[in-house]
Amino acid sequence: MEVAEAGVDGVAGRRQQEEASGAAPFGRSSSLIGAAGFDGALRELKDLRSQLHQTADCCEKAFLDTEKKKLILESTKGYICDAIVAVIDHLGTVSSKLEQQLQEKIEITQTEKKLNFLKQRLLTCEQYAITLKLLTVRGDNDAIQYHRRYLSQSTGGTKEENGANSRKDDVKFVEYNSPTIPGAILTFKPYDIQSTIGRERSVATTDSESPTTDAKSSFSFRAEDVPIVLAEHRKKANHGSNILSFIRKGRRHA
């Protein structure tokens, strides 16, 4: 009878141990559980929490119903170790998935930064090209500096007039070849600088009796010397007329 009772107790203890061990939702190969993504890993972690609560309730019932509590405690310790390993495994999976997503976001941000850097370089190149074009336009002497409607049509005429005035200011000495006869009266026309530049004039005399008509002398002529020359010749003419009048008076008295 005692042997039969011992056998019944052994079978009951094995059944309770199997129930306690069967309550565990995972074994030591729980690290092989994979998740498709970060959301799947979080979902498995939540399911693991509910499974741990269910296993704790089963172990408590088995511990209260059986007389071999030491065996239930040992099986519960083993289950707790497996549960801790599974939880750590799930946490590692969640962290790896999270790190993977963060890495993808970092790669995206890095590519965006590279694109922005390339755009900035292109912009600097365009600005440099624009500055070079501006320098070439500034260096072009034939380029139009103002708008056409702000330019008058008399611009070219004013430039020519300014050039002519600058030429008039620079009066040159002109050489004249003319016969010089003492006592002759010289007459000059009003001078024109543009017509006299680079030309020679011969001064005609009214007295043709002198034998020195072929003698020629070159002298330089200036506009301001005209009244001086006229005054000298008038003095000589008056002196000659005075001599002639004196001779005539002497003949009359004789």
From Swiss-Prot:
Binds SCAR. Involved in regulation of actin and microtubule organization. Part of a WAVE complex that activates the Arp2/3 complex. This is Probable protein ABIL5. Keywords: Cytoplasm, Cytoskeleton. Belongs to the ABI family. InterPro entries: ABI (IPR028457). Coiled coil: none annotated. The lineage of its organism: Eukaryota, Viridiplantae, Streptophyta, Embryophyta, Tracheophyta. One of its GO terms (cellular component) is cytoskeleton. It is found in: Cytoplasm, Cytoskeleton. The keyword Cytoplasm applies. Residues 1-26 are annotated as: Disordered.
